[in-house]
């Protein structure tokens, strides 16, 4: 989550003209369409959020160009960024949610860093949880980050925005559920890393950065408490969200990206399969002798059919 300065803001929705509404509508469409597609077609929600955030960011960049050309006025997203000292009534509570879908248009690494985590960590986590439970975890991280930033900066007039709380929430949830899963991630080297290493590395770095910002009073344009809030909230609530899900907590099969996970699934199927060696052939069922020329092929057929992928 990034911080901005109040002087960047100039307009609110009550002052929108046609151009502003068109640009805002395009931003909503860019964000919502990929997510809607994933829900309707049962594809990866994590990837659709990644695409939606990136497309929405591109619309924000278009908005900056439009502002420079004076096609629209001022800073378009004023009503959707999180400003702690204005959340003193119900009118601004929506910014605890909406700020998580905006990113700093001045720093492309802000959105790129978030979507990298959401894609690489979110996809295997979604495979563990299923779409609905993953959506719940994502929102828990988003709200947890926003609430933490609000609580630690009650009187601050500085706006913040970004999906970092949700991204860190994915780390926290994965650590709570399946810490020994291995997922591909570019940490020093691009290779598979155990989730516990990745999550604790990112969490530890944020604790250090938060200390240097708050404890040592060093300047920072990053809302570190939002990152920590998203991580902790998702970590604490993951056992509740994951209850009754596709995988038991703590299962050690290497993770959804490993072949061991597929073997585990096949073994689970096989455990409830009927033993084909006990199957009754048509001749025996009619109390007839099996013809000699059929006995060996029949025995081979029953043996080869006793696997999940040949049933």
List each model region and its residues.
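A detector for small-residue-rich transmembrane helices and their helix-helix packing motifs
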Residues: 2-279, 283, 293-297, 301
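Charged, low-complexity interaction regions
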Residues: 284-289, 304-310
């Amino acid at each position: 989550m990034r911080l901005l300065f109040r002087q960047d803001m100039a307009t609110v929705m009550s002052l929108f003209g046609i151009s502003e509404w068109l640009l805002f509508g395009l931003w909503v469409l860019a964000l919502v369409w990929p997510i809607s597609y994933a829900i309707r077609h049962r594809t990866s929600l994590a990837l659709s959020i990644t695409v939606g955030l990136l497309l929405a960011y591109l619309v924000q960049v278009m908005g900056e160009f439009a502002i420079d050309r004076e096609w629209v006025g001022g800073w378009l997203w004023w009503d959707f960024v999180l400003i702690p000292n204005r959340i003193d009534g119900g009118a601004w509570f929506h910014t605890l949610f909406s700020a998580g879908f905006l990113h700093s248009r001045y720093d492309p690494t802000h959105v790129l860093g978030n979507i990298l985590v959401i894609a690489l960590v979110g996809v295997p986590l979604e495979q563990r949880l299923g779409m609905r439970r993953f959506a719940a975890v994502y929102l828990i991280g988003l709200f947890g980050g926003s609430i933490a930033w609000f609580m630690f900066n009650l009187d601050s007039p500085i706006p913040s925005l970004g999906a970092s709380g949700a991204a860190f929430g994915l780390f926290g949830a994965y650590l709570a559920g399946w810490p020994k899963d291995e997922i591909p991630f570019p940490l020093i080297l691009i290779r598979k890393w155990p989730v516990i290493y990745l999550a604790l590395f990112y969490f530890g770095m944020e604790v250090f950065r938060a200390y240097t910002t708050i404890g040592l009073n060093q300047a920072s344009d990053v809302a570190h408490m939002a990152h920590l809030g998203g991580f902790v909230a998702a970590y604490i609530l993951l056992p509740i969200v994951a209850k009754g899900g596709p995988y038991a907590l703590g299962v050690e099969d290497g993770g959804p990206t490993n072949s061991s996970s597929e073997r585990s699934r096949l073994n689970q199927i096989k455990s409830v399969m009927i033993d084909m060696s006990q199957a009754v052939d048509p001749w025996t069922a009619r109390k007839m002798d099996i013809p000699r020329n059929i006995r060996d092929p029949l025995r081979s057929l029953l043996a080869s059919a006793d696997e999940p992928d040949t049933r």
